[in-house]
Design a protein with these regions (language model features):
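A glycine-rich beta-turn/hairpin centered on an aromatic-Pro dipeptide
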Residues: 174-183
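NTP-binding/hydrolysis catalytic cores, primarily Walker-type P-loop NTPases
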Residues: 10, 182-242
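P-loop NTP-binding catalytic core
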Residues: 1-34, 51-54
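Hydrophobic residues embedded in beta-strands of well-ordered beta-sheets
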Residues: 172-174, 203
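ATP-binding Walker
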Residues: 42-44
Length: 242
């Protein structure tokens, strides 16, 4: 299945997330944005992470990337060289890695990783590394509070590097936000992309308001972005509504 993995297609068919949002996220991942998935305890968190990682491997526009798993039992040391990272984990090797050849798979960002490892893993995002991150947090404000607090004490600019943030429960995506990197002293609030309305049993979709940002972050003009999004929608088996 070109450009979209079978696991992602299955999540859409199960109703875990909508096809338009899945297509948008897959394009943003192709462009190098990080993806962060939040939940307290839910197998869906890892399923979503694995599905988008598989989709990134399918992308014809993205070259091969080594997936480096940053987990609670791994102790990483990162080199200061801005063109590469060094991992003291024997499974990942110790040679510096280019930004273009690495995908970090960060698990246990809050309450799992050793604080120093978590800080350095997030700091690497500002240096251009891409990551798919799983974090134990009920929502985005709680994640920010945990990352600001002791022992992590991450600066605000690092918090804005988390890319697309999904909040999930055991069955579906409940909310999605797009974060915006700081520009100088200017910090933009997160953009709400979708929110699950439990009383109506449907998602409230706000991605239409973020289309210019999607195209800009993907380094495309709007027409090209819309065409690629339409193609992904077709692959996912759902006609585009916009």
């Amino acid at each position: 299945m070109t450009e979209v993995s079978a696991p992602l297609h299955e999540l859409v068919l199960e109703g875990a997330l909508e096809a338009p949002l899945a297509a948008h996220i897959s394009i943003l991942l192709d462009a190098g944005l990080p993806l962060t998935i939040l939940a307290i305890e839910s197998p869906l968190r890892q399923r979503v992470a694995d599905a988008f990682a598989a989709t990134l491997r399918h992308a014809s526009s993205v070259g091969h990337r080594d997936e480096i798993f940053v987990e609670s039992d791994h102790h990483f040391e990162w080199l200061g060289d801005p063109v590469g990272i060094g991992c003291m984990d024997p499974l990942a090797g110790t040679n510096p890695r280019s930004v273009r050849t690495v995908l970090l798979r960060v698990s246990g960002l809050v309450g799992g990783l050793e604080p120093g490892c978590a800080r350095i893993a997030l700091r690497s995002l500002a240096r251009g590394y891409q990551a798919i991150i799983e974090a134990q947090a009920p929502d985005l404000p709680a994640l920010f509070d945990a990352l600001r607090a002791t022992p992590l004490r991450l600066p605000e600019d690092d918090l804005q590097q988390l890319g697309v943030v999904l909040r999930v429960d055991t069955t579906r995506v409940l909310a999605a936000h797009l974060l915006h990197p700081s520009v100088g002293t200017v910090r933009r609030p997160p953009t709400l992309l979708t929110n699950w309305d439990a009383s109506a049993g449907r998602w409230d979709d706000f991605t239409w308001a973020a289309l210019p940002a999607f195209a800009e972050r993907s380094r495309m003009n709007q027409a090209k972005y819309d065409a690629i999004h339409q193609a992904r929608m077709t692959i996912l088996g759902t006609p585009a509504s916009r």
